[in-house]
Amino acid sequence: DSTNINFFNPSSYSRLSKGNTLMSLGLDSRFSFYEQAGVSEFKTSTMFDHFSLAFKATKRSGFAFGLKPYSNVGYEFSQSIFTGIDSVRYTYAGRGNLQDAYAGFAFAPISSSRSNLSFGANISYLFGFVSNERKSELLNAETNPGGLSLDLTRLSSFHYQLGAHFEHRIGKSNLILVGISIDPEQDFNGSLENSLYTSANIN
């Protein structure tokens, strides 16, 4: 589609409409419903999804760049368990996101009114962090002793993606279209921190 930015397949940039700069801005809204042991909870969240700009460079080529999500984490829930003497509350929470700042180019060696064959690539930089934690505490103890386990992942690495696109028109009303996007196996630079805290009162 020459009026939409398909940043999941970089070969599509060569099919953009000539003379127009396309911009895409997205927001992501999530509605979550949790229920356990008769207790229910409803949560909503809205976050930035993506921003992209794309334009036709020549008759056979196109460019695009922007910022898109690579991974998002956002949750929090808890449960209480009676141990026979006291109740222990476990709280699980995850937050953070990995962002993908990318620039892409596509070229079509075959471009006619009947057939089109295009190849493209995105070069991007991945960055961000994701944390997952588990917290426990005794509810009825005077000092509320407990503990906290925290896993923190940080990512800072380059990444690339390849794409191909072929279409051929048969008659006036039939079109064969095949697209492929390849995300090769790659090594990312990052770090993983595992921490365990114990205290008489963790807040």
Question: Over which residues does each language-model region extend?
Answer:
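Outer-membrane beta-barrel porins/channels
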Residues: 1, 60-203
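N-terminal, post-signal peptide beta-strand-biased segments of exported outer-membrane/organellar beta-barrel
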Residues: 1-71
